[in-house]
Amino acid sequence: MAEPQDLPPELSPNRYIEKVSLVTNEVLEEEIEPRQLLVHHHRDYHVVDVQARTFMSRLVDATGDEDLAREKMRKIRARGFKAAEVIAKATGLKDPEKVSRALFGLKEREYYFRYKKHPASREAIDARYAELRQQGEEQMARARDEAGRPRLRVLLTGGTGFVGKEILWQAAHDPEIVEMVVLIRPKEIRDRKTGELLETHSPAQRGESLLGQLWLETPEERSKFRFIAGDVEQPQLGVSDEDYAELQSSMTHVIHCAASVAFDDPYERSFQANVTGTLNALRFSLGLQQHEGSPFVAHLGIETSYIHGRQVRKVAREDEIVFPRNFYNNFYELTKAMASLETERFMLEKGLRVVQLCPAIVIGESQGGNNRGDTKVVNAPVNVFGRAHEALRDPDGDWFERTRASMLARMACIFPGNPSAELNLIPVDWVVKGILSAVKRPRAIGERVHLATDNRVTSEQIRDIVQEELGVDIKLAEPTLHRTVTLPVLSKILTGLKQPRIANALEKLGSIFGGYSEWGQPIHEVGNDVRVLGLPEKRPNTQHAFRMLCRHNRYVQDFGRIRDLDEIARREKVWAQLMEELEERSGGPAGAVSAADFRAFINERLDADSFVLR
C-alpha cells in the first residue's frame, strides 16, 4: 500500500471534503489522503473481494440487470457476516468483524465522504444567481450595436488544445464574435541531445501557425484573432500588466478551457493544472468584471460531466454536485470537481458571473471524426487496436519475430470491459456549439450544463464498430480479473520479451480506461443544453460519431503515426472534402454508411499513399 502523502495545506482535500462517521454522523477531524477518494483504494484488497466483484460482473453480463447483481451481493455479504459470527463464537474469538475481514474480506464502512456545504440557504443561492443573471443581461445589452447585434470580445485559455482548436474554428465563422484574444505560452525549441536552446517561438508565431493548421488563411478569417503571452498556472494568468489593463476595458467574456486531461497524472499535477489554474482564471475574470466601466459579461468555465464520479447508475444531476458513493476513477475527475466547487464559491461570495459547462468524454467532430491531431483519451486505444491489427496482418522478420509480433498484437487486443457498460461520448463540434451558445446567453449564468448525450454507447457496441471498421477482433475481458490477474501476468511476459513500453501502454490502457468500461456507470442528466443554451433536442448519434473516429484515425492519422500537425491539417482538409462528397452521394451522414461501402468509396476517391483526391 502506498505511503500517506504529505501535502501542503493548500493542496489538502480537507479544504473541500469532510469525512463523516456513519455511527455518530459527526465530522472526523483527520487528514484525508487523496488516494482514499479513488475507487482503486477500496477494492481488490482481498481474494474474496476479487471473486465477489468478478461474480457481480458476470451476473450483470448474463442478465443485464445491475440492480439484481447488487441485491445478490447484499445477500452474500449478510451471509458472510453471519458466518463470521458463528465462527467467532465457535472459536472463542471476541471480535467477529476481525474474522469477517480476515476470512472473507468483509468490512463495514465506518465513514463516508461529503463535500463541504456552503452556508448560504437554497433561497439565498437562487436569489444570488438571479441577481447575477440580471447583471449579465444588462451587460449583454451594452455589448450590442445599434442594430441589436452582439459585438463580443472573448479571451480564450487552452486554445492549443483539442477543444480549444474547435473553439477557434467555430469562432472564426461566427460574425457576433468580433475579437478573440488567445493566451499562449512561448515555445522553446531545444536540441534533443544537448538540451541547448535553439530558438523560441513567440505567441504570435505560434498563433499564426495554429491558424494555418485550422485552414484559416485569408486576412478576413485571421483578423479577429490576437495571441498574447500567458500561463494559466501563474497569477494573473501570466499576462503582463500592460495587456491586462487593455483587456479590462475591452473583453466581454473569458472562456477558460485550459486543463490537464491526463487521466493518469498524480494528484499534485492534476491539482495544479485543474484547481490552481481555475482559481487563477476566476481571479483574472473577477478583475475584469470589477474594473470601472468594464464591458465584461461572464466567465465560462469548461469542466467535465465526470465531476460526479462513480455514482453507480444514479442520475448525476446538473443542479448539484455530491461526493460519489463509489468514489472517483482518477485525480482528473476529483480535481475538476474541486475546481467546480471553487467556481461556485466565486459566484456566491464574490459575485463573479459564471457559466459552468461540463462536457462528457469528448471525441472527434461528428461529420468526419476530425480531432485536430489529438491522440489521447479515446483515440489512444483505437490507435493501439489499429496497429495491433496491422502487426497481425503484415508480420515482418523471421519465424521468431513473426511469432513474437503476433503474440504482442493479440495481447494488445484484450480490453477490460463489461459488454453492457455505457460510455458517454460527445463530438467536439457539439460541445463547442454549446460553449459559443453560452457566450450569447446571459440566462446561463449560475447554471451547470452537461454537454453530454442521452444516447450512450456500450462497450459491446464499441467492440463491434472497431471490428467492422478496423478488422480487429477485440476481446472484452472481465475487468476485475483482468486488473488483478491477467494484466500482471501480461506485464511479466512483456518484460521478459524486453517490451517494457508495450507493457506500460497496456497497463495504462487498463487502468485509465477500464474504469469507464465497467458496469455501473453514472447517467449524466441532460436538458440544460436545450432549455438554457438553445441547442437542438436531437443530440449527435454516438455510434456514428465513434465510427467516424475509427475511420479518421485509420486514414488521416495512420493510427497516431502521423505526428506533424501541418501534415495532419492538410490531410484533414482533404478528408473534410471527401466527407462532404460522400454525404452528398449517400444522402445521409457519413457515419451511417456501412464499413464496406465506406472502404469502397475511399479506395475509389483517395490515393492513400499521397493522401490526395483521385
Q: Model features per residue range: what roles?
A:
Residues 249, 253-258, 264-272, 276-331, ...:
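Conserved Rossmann-fold NAD(P)-dependent oxidoreductase catalytic core, especially the SDR/UDP-sugar
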Residues 97-115, 121-133, 137, 153, ...:
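Amphipathic terminal alpha-helices
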Residues 388-418, 484-537, 568, 574-575, ...:
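A hydrophobic C-terminal alpha-helical subdomain
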